[in-house]
Amino acid sequence: MSGVNEIRSTFLNFFAANGHEIVPSSPLVPRNDPTLMFTNAGMVQFKNVFTGVEKRPYHRATTSQKCVRAGGKHNDLDNVGYTARHHTFFEMLGNFSFGDYFKENAIELAWKLVTKEFGLPKDKLTATVYIDDDEAFGLWKKIAGLPESRIIRIAGSDNFWQMGDTGPCGPCSEIFYDHGDKVWGGPPGSPEADGDRFIEIWNLVFMQYEQLEGGVRNPLPKPSIDTGAGLERVAAVLQGKHDNYDIDLFVALIRAIADLTNADPQGPQKASLRVIADHLRASSFLISDGVLPSNEGRGYVLRRIMRRAMRHAQLLGAREPLMHKLVGALTREMGQAYPELIRAEALIKETLRLEETRFRKTLERGLAILDEKSSTLKKGDMFDGDVAFTLYDTYGFPLDLTQDALKSRGISVDQASFTDAMERQRAKARAAWAGSGEAATENVWFPLREKLGATEFLGYETETAEGAVTALVKDGAEVEGLKAGESGAIVLNQTPFYGESGGQVGDTGVMSGDGVRVRITDTQKKAGDLFVHIGTVEQGTLKLGAALQLEVDHGRRSAIRANHSATHILHEALRQVLGDHIAQRGSLVSPDRLRFDFAHPKPISAEELARVEDIANDVVLENAEVTTRLMALDDAREAGARALFGEKYGDEVRVVSMGNAARDQASNAQASNAMGWSVELCGGTHVKRTGDIGLIAVTSESAVSSGVRRIEALTARGARAHANHNLSLAKAAAAELRTTVDEVPARIAALMEERKKLERELSDARKKLAMGGGAAAGGSASGIREVAGVKLMARAVEGVEMKDLKSLVDEAKKQLGSGVVAIVGRAEDGKAGVVVGVTADLTARFNAVELVRAASEALGGKGGGGRPDMAQAGGPDGSKAEAALAAIESAISRAG
């Protein structure tokens, strides 16, 4: 047994043969668990099973769980690449018993696997137990035959596990492998335990107590088992390696990186190769599970991981994006075990490529500032934390990247001042929000929800109903009544008004009764499920307890229904055209338009957009039934219902299905689910049949942020008006161009080509005129004179663009052979650009950047940039062109 894939299969198959259900790895983004940023252990997906909240159809399970540790207390990021066993991404092998077997069976199964299936020598294995766990101590003697000297009692948290301050807990027992006396270190619990001789390969947790407040522990009625073995560690032991990065999986990835960068895997660039290999896995798996790089939350952690790898790619000498070229090597190694990698391969590649392209610009700016600010520091010094925060806040340079860049020079970052700067910014944001008046208003809803309970929503079945006023709120405080002309928020015991959520806007309408009439302009959901109606009393006085007739604006609701159903259809159509990686990132469903944001790394072509629109309208024309049903969350997921990424769902969810499950094979759209063509978890309102949408017209496609695209669309009458408007524009264009509508594109293309030709001719004419008749500094007809022993060509020209100024300078340098060329171009808006060129033989004496900065200052500008042989700048005052040329001449004189 040698390969990682074989080791993983052996583990899972062993436990399957012993009555365990092989459960697929859960996503890296924990479902319905706000306490965790990422899945970081095998037991995470079984948390509710262990606590009794959730029931599963099995009592024994085994998994190979994807895990990421790169944030919070489990942050291994800084160590990755520099140690033998730190990773941001790793796989946790595990077996679990939910009130079935306990200690004896757990130890027996573990010992049988490591000694029989894995073939590890018994004399190389040592076990630890919690200090007072006599039962486990005796079982290791009985089952494994270990001598007491190799069953070590350990006190403290290392051998006692707790889910939290309260809840299930219990002692642990760990299996260690002894690498032999050639490696420094001592057994667990000894003074030399920090050495690498004894390596933990498996941790068995015996959940046998419930921790209560006050430190009391009661025995659990059904003790359980939770075990975890790091696959990379196990593979290293089985492959005879002392370093996780020497196992077959990492060797293959590092070889792929080395082939592209010509780096030596055993040379001084070893750490960079390892960083990239590790971070490639973390980045790719996070993207495949729906996380995209951003500046907050999980997306920011992903961006930090990606950018750290990209920084090391730059250290290896990569001059163009590298990471995306390595995804194929990763899918070859891990795609069979994790097919989601293969499904999302295109998204992973494009996301990595775009992020690295952007980051290279950030890296250049950030490193330049870092070099400047740390130029006077020496080994052992501290880098200013405020500057580190500026790099983070202004330039997108993560703190760990700053630390990493300074690490090789022995310079540390003042993290305390960095944290202070971060907190000052957060305090400003909190103060701004609190001072906006929103804080007081928001604070009223949670106590009301506790007092009144949830509002019963009737809007799926009806748009008219009766309701009683249970609370009135004005200016953030509860009131007894609202008079005519006053506006406020109204809470009812039940309502047909939909509260804004899931991207769908809130309903509007009218409430009336006993001389009172209220115009409702918005409906919102607060504190989870408290429906709050925003409105103005038009007649009478509205009082607490009033009975009202409630009527939603039917026409507006109808338009919203059509637009909401259209978003579902467009979502599935986008998946059909662009790939399975398409996942919703947000939406807006209003009566007059819809907006849909989704994960996709690049713009959608006109052809792709047309296909999406065609598929969507095929489903509309089918006039298929739209069905809704309530289902258990797990049943809905197993049935293939799509969920909004990051949304929290209860145990029971509403599933909306539309489109025929079995479609005509000649149709543009193909079946995606037995329940329907589009199947999503959704709490919004929808049409009865897809034909009620009428027509879907996509009006725009754009970028929202890195890796997130947006389409906007119209339905029904809005779509028809849009189509008619476009046709009118096409007819008007055809009339203006004296051609037919069908020939308009070809006619425009011909005109654009003619325009390009004329622009080229005009540019050439301007350049000839500029070099032949522009004003020359010093009055020389040719503009060439000698300054400080070198030839200087200095001219001011009119109407020449910056790109043309550069070509003029290049041509003039060739003509001069040796010398300096300076050309100032005055634009029509009064501004000026200046380009300075220095021939190669003179760059040791004259720097084009320094010369151009002197000119820029004369023009009222600041700075300038380029290379020693060619630089450019600009300024707002083109009337000072001659002064700019004189400044260059003076600078040459001083330098000469």
From Swiss-Prot:
GO terms for molecular function: alanine-tRNA ligase activity; aminoacyl-tRNA deacylase activity; ATP binding; tRNA binding; zinc ion binding. Zn(2+) binds at H564, H568, C682, H686. Its EC number is 6.1.1.7. Its cofactor is Zn(2+). Pfam families: DHHA1, tRNA-synt_2c, tRNA_SAD. It is found in: Cytoplasm. The keyword ATP-binding applies. InterPro entries: aa-tRNA-synth_II/BPL/LPL, Ala-tRNA-lgiase_IIc, Ala-tRNA-ligase_IIc_anticod-bd, Ala-tRNA-synth_IIc_core, Ala-tRNA-synth_IIc_N, Ala-tRNA_ligase, Ala_tRNA_ligase_euk/bac, DHHA1_dom. Keywords: Aminoacyl-tRNA synthetase, ATP-binding, Cytoplasm, Ligase, Metal-binding, Nucleotide-binding, Protein biosynthesis, RNA-binding, tRNA-binding, Zinc. GO terms for biological process: alanyl-tRNA aminoacylation; negative regulation of DNA-templated transcription. One of its GO terms (cellular component) is cytosol. Residues 859-878 are annotated as: Disordered. Catalyzes the attachment of alanine to tRNA(Ala) in a two-step reaction: alanine is first activated by ATP to form Ala-AMP and then transferred to the acceptor end of tRNA(Ala). Also edits incorrectly charged Ser-tRNA(Ala) and Gly-tRNA(Ala) via its editing domain. NCBIfam families: alaS (TIGR00344). Belongs to the class-II aminoacyl-tRNA synthetase family. This is Alanine--tRNA ligase. It comes from Bradyrhizobium sp. (strain BTAi1 / ATCC BAA-1182).
